[in-house]
């Protein structure tokens, strides 16, 4: 941390927002805000209730990214003062009203219970604003100017307009305008970054009025991927990451929920899976937990995408159904059959596997579909040699295996589509196995920019996350132990993706690098990845944050600035220092609770 403090002292309060908005203007007037400030929620569309007056609204900005934010007439839906805290609990899917209600509640909590005292962002002997004689924020107007799409709680990429505008006048009127509830939530998040806790612990203020912001994201898919199989995580661990995602305007949370090491997902119709496959019977995500996590994400405009990786990375199934898995836990020559131990792969030509997957997905998919438009079927690092031990195949010949893999993927994706979900796969299915994928399928790339270029050249939508930049677990050394006879050959025991990926490296990654201009529209966005061989609840927060925030800004603001240049570390460093402090408060205080 010694290197961060000097950067903090360089912070210009005119540019401390993260991720960086499209346009931002501010002044130097001090305004204090009280806990009883009213939130006036205005809305257009057919679902408006509690109408008490009609308010024509005009927002004018030379650089407004969304002309639809202008000249809209909206109605007062309701006024909220001192909103109750919410944990997002509920039954069924999430509506636009749910998102705005939660956003107002969490904004109030952030302003008055989780705010930042910015002492380290000023030089010594800085004179803190005094409440006496200062102006006040008199109201916060939240205006949703268009009817939300039906899919607001589980959208496909691009279905929700996430743009917003924000103004704060010297007279103390804050106005957030957006075409969707998610955009309004983003605007409220930005509003909290304009305010700071006073050292007297009784007041909250800004010294930036008047403010004018217009903003919208560069990429449609902005997320992190958390592996909850190799280490066991609690619901609260997951919720904290969702909170931080939302605060960084990330809109996807990828839950890599199962792998060879453990099966922590409870499947009520197949209880043996988690009862025998989890590290302990209590280290599971119950059906209720699973619903809670998905809804908690959706109510913050963060779509949780669940992944059950297959056919590889499935050794944990063998603890309950050994007949379904080939090459299970082979030692010591595990590297012949898998990328890492324990080995184990679903058999590729077994009717029993098909029956199992049909039952598994019939259980899981209906519990995913209220909260997500996607389901991730995995497909990475499948080792052909495992099938030499599969009595249904007995070969590692690609000519024999490829048609069987095609059949395997088709079977799974057909079932995913029947529930109205869009399949997601890892890049190997397309690039290594030459599986023909439907044009609806999202391909997730992790190995190289060249792979992204290949995927888009084939006409497929892609998610980026090059392991050389956006793998957050790298640089911690080998997690395997070596026999003394061969240990010297692995010295100094670096992992495969060393060195450690610091925020500057993460920030330097361009998701569009190497992609032909005519194919760049197929890059939906990307994810930063947290694999958990050496990460657990003890260190997960600091392993992900604030480095993932660097990826969040690239995905929201783009890798290039308005002049087409690579984004500046000089500009980013002080802003990231402040976001680090705010993320720490969000994570340390834990999930929003009722």
Per-region residue spans from a language model:
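Fungal secretory targeting signals
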Residues: 1-16
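Contiguous, structured surface segment used for ligand recognition
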Residues: 14-218, 551, 555-562, 569, ...
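Structural recognition of the beta-strand scaffold that forms the well-ordered cores
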Residues: 31-33, 37, 41, 222-225, ...
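Flexible, acidic glycine-rich loops studded with aromatic residues
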Residues: 114-117, 121, 423-431, 435-441, ...
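Feature activates predominantly on carbohydrate-active enzymes
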Residues: 151-356, 361-376, 527-531
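Loop/turn elements at helix/coil->beta-strand transitions in domains of secreted/extracellular proteins
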Residues: 248-253, 298-303, 370-373, 417-422, ...
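Active-site neighborhood of glycoside hydrolase catalytic domains
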Residues: 335-337, 342-441, 446-456
């Amino acid at each position: 941390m010694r290197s961060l403090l000097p950067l903090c002292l360089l912070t210009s309060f005119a540019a401390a927002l993260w991720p960086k908005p499209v346009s931002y203007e501010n002044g130097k007037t001090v305004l204090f805000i009280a806990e009883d400030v009213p939130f006036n929620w205005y809305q257009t569309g057919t679902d408006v209730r509690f109408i008490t007056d009609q308010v024509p609204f005009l927002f004018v900005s030379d650089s407004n990214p969304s002309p639809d934010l202008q000249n809209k007439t909206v109605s007062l839906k309701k006024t909220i003062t001192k909103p109750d805290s919410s944990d997002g609990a509920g039954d069924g899917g999430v509506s636009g009203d749910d998102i705005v209600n939660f956003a107002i509640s969490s904004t109030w909590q952030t302003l008055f219970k989780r705010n930042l005292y910015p002492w380290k962002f000023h030089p010594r002997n800085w004179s803190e604003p005094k409440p006496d004689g200062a102006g006040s924020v008199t109201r916060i107007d939240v205006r949703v100017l268009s009817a939300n799409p039906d899919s607001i709680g589980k959208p496909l990429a691009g279905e929700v307009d996430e743009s917003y505008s924000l103004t704060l006048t010297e007279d103390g009127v804050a106005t957030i305008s957006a075409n969707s509830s998610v955009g309004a939530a983003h605007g409220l998040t930005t509003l909290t970054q304009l305010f700071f806790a006073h050292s007297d612990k009784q007041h909250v203020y800004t010294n930036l009025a008047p403010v004018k912001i217009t903003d919208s994201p560069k990429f449609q898919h902005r997320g992190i991927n958390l592996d909850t199989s190799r280490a066991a995580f609690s619901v609260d661990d997951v919720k904290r990451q969702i909170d931080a995602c939302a605060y960084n305007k990330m809109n996807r949370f990828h839950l890599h929920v199962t792998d060879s090491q453990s099966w922590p997902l409870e499947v009520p119709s197949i209880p043996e899976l988690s009862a025998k496959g989890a590290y302990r019977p209590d280290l599971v995500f119950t059906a209720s937990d699973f619903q809670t996590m998905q809804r908690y994400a959706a109510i913050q405009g963060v779509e949780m995408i669940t992944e059950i990786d297959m056919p590889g990375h499935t050794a944990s199934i063998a603890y309950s159904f050994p007949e379904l898995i080939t090459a299970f836990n082979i030692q010591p020559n595990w590297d012949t059959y898998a990328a890492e131990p324990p080995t184990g792969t679903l058999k590729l030509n077994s009717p029993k596997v098909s029956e199992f997957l049909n039952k598994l997905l019939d259980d899981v998919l209906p519990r995913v579909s209220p909260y997500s438009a996607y389901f991730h079927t995995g497909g990475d690092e499948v080792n052909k040699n495992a099938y030499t031990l599969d009595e249904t195949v007995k070969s590692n010949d690609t000519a024999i295996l490829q048609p069987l893999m095609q059949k395997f993927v088709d079977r799974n994706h057909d079932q995913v589509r029947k529930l109205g979900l869009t399949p997601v796969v890892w890049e190997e299915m397309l690039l290594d196995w030459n599986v023909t994928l439907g044009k609806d399928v999202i391909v997730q790339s992790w190995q190289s920019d060249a792979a992204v270029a290949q995927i888009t050249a084939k006409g497929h939508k892609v998610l980026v996350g090059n392991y050389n930049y956006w793998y957050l677990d790298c640089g911690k050394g080998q997690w395997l132990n070596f026999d003394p006879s061969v240990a010297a050959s692995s010295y100094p025991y670096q992992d495969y993706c060393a060195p450690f990926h610091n925020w500057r490296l993460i920030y330097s990654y361009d998701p569009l690098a190497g992609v032909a201009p005519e194919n760049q529209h197929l890059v939906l966005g990307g994810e930063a990845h947290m694999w958990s061989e050496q990460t657990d609840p003890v260190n997960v927060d600091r392993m992900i944050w604030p480095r993932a925030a660097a990826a969040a800004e690239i995905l929201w603001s783009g890798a290039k600035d308005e002049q087409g240049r690579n984004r500046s570390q000089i500009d980013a460093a002080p802003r990231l220092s402040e976001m680090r402090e705010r993320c720490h408060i969000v994570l340390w205080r834990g999930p929003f609770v009722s």
